[in-house]
Amino acid sequence: MSPDAIKLLKEKVFDKSKWMQLPRDVVIGHDVLGQIAPVCEDLKLGRSALLISGKNTMDRAGKTVQDVIGKTCDVMVYISDEISPAVIKDAEKAAKDVDFVIGVGGGRVIDTAKIVSYNLDRQFVSVPTAASHDGIASARASVPTGEGNVSLEAHPPIAIIADTCIIASAPHRLLAAGCADVISNYTAILDWEMAHRIKGEPMSEYAVALSKMTAEILVKNADLIRPNQEQSAWFVTKALVSSGVAMSIAGSSRPASGGEHKFSHALDRLAPNKALHGESCGIGTIISMYLHGGDWRGIRQSLRTIGAPVTPTDVGIADEIAVEALLMAKTIRPERFTIFDMGITRDSAEKLIQMLYAD
């Protein structure tokens, strides 16, 4: 008689659970800043807000948001172009009595709003003025320290208001960096799948599918990404939001952050303020795809078509520094297993960097 036939044990109960925090309202399009008031009303966010912005982004979009939301809410304004622990603490003091937080600007502003709202247990609304990385929609925030950027877990925006006219008017370099950040999903997924096979790391098939599809759409339509075109801004912003949602589904940044991101963080430590986050991720993606045995030339060509850098020289970084970044990558978030943790020697690192320049 089989053990199951005895029926002495109670039946196993399905007890898995998953808490996913996702943006509830997403508005992307031409001249949509005016829709922030009905969105906040729909979400019942409250009657007082702290608007965090930078000097230039306040002029480009912040004042419009302030005027629109000011008709129904009391709005305080906090201006800072930098992000640091000191800035975050100062912004928290300004936000302690408000109902919600609005971030109007680029990555530093959005990340500041994200951390402040998380620490104070408030909701926040993301109003990006550039589409340079997937932080506009994700739960992750990056804070620079003396040893490089530190990635923190916060919560995603409850709403995203992205005006394509404003985003398209930003320097094309920012949009191209955003594209590269999304394209890096390709190798992030490969690393995640490898960690699942080798280390038994849990993996979300839904997050994998969404992340991969988002990267594929950008690669297949790379020739449509053009400077100062709202259609391009629309296309890239939607992809960045999808990438952020994939991370929320997974409950981690795994669907969009693998070895290429570890390389990016290492490069940022060794050559600060040289490359944008998405730019260095794009370069790292080419290397990672080569190591995975994938179509690295195709990735490189897509990045070139978009206008993103594909070599260290393109961003003013010496090849020797890039070699050191490759060797350092495995020390960044060592708990995250990637292809760069498989044992890259100095000789192979030098060859990998030279490979970027190959015909």
From Swiss-Prot:
Substrate binds at residues 134, 181, 265. SUPFAM superfamilies: Dehydroquinate synthase-like (SSF56796). NAD(+) binds at residues 107-111, 129-132, 138. One of its GO terms (molecular function) is glycerol-1-phosphate dehydrogenase (NAD+) activity. InterPro entries: G1P_dehydrogenase_arc (IPR023002), G1PDH (IPR032837), Glycerol_DH (IPR016205). It is found in: Cytoplasm. Catalyzes the NAD(P)H-dependent reduction of dihydroxyacetonephosphate (DHAP or glycerone phosphate) to glycerol 1-phosphate (G1P). The G1P thus generated is used as the glycerophosphate backbone of phospholipids in the cellular membranes of Archaea. This is Glycerol-1-phosphate dehydrogenase [NAD(P)+]. It comes from Methanoregula boonei (strain DSM 21154 / JCM 14090 / 6A8). The lineage of its organism: Archaea, Methanobacteriati, Methanobacteriota, Stenosarchaea group, Methanomicrobia. The gene is egsA.
